[in-house]
UniProtKB/Swiss-Prot annotation:
The modification Asparagine amide is found at N70. Residues 19-43, 74-123 form a propeptide. Its main location: secreted. This is Maximins 4/H3 type 1. Residues 1-18 form the signal peptide. The modification Isoleucine amide is found at I143.
């Protein structure tokens, strides 16, 4: 008779273990789905922020370009205007990277392409950071 109880208890334990494993698998799959959804939301928010940042930089560059386009310009103003135009072109090329890369890479070898992109990164980052810094500095002065 003890043997029957041992078999019954073993069967009961095995079925309880199987049910708990099944619940664990279901909860893991639900957790994976939730994580995937949250990652999609984060990517969506990141995309929106990036496009908003690009739009803001384009707007800032256009405003500054219009400011320097009107009236007499010094050599320094002319240089700033050239940089702003280059930044605007580079920002436009971010919207259509395939077309821009096709235009820029026609007739270049790989080393020239690498140098071009390094120069392009410096050309984008330098003026953009300078413009953002100047704009923030002006805002801080107005607030303070």
């Amino acid at each position: 008779m003890n043997f029957k109880y041992i078999i019954a208890v073993s069967f009961f334990i095995a079925s309880a273990y199987a049910r708990s494993e099944e619940k664990d698998v279901q909860s893991l799959s639900q957790r994976d789905v939730l994580e995937e959804e949250s990652l999609r939301e984060i990517r969506g928010i990141g995309g929106v922020l990036l496009s908003a940042g690009k739009a803001a930089l384009k707007g800032l560059a256009k405003v500054l370009a219009e400011k320097y386009a009107n009236g007499k310009r010094t050599a320094e103003d002319h240089e700033v205007m050239k940089r702003l135009e280059a930044v605007m072109r580079d920002l436009d090329s971010l919207d259509h990277p395939e077309e821009a890369s096709e235009r820029e890479t026609r007739g270049f070898n790989q080393e020239e392409i690498a140098n071009l992109f390094t120069k392009k990164e410096k050309r984008i980052l330098g003026p953009v950071l300078g413009l953002v810094g100047n704009a923030l500095g002006g805002l801080i002065k107005k607030i303070g």
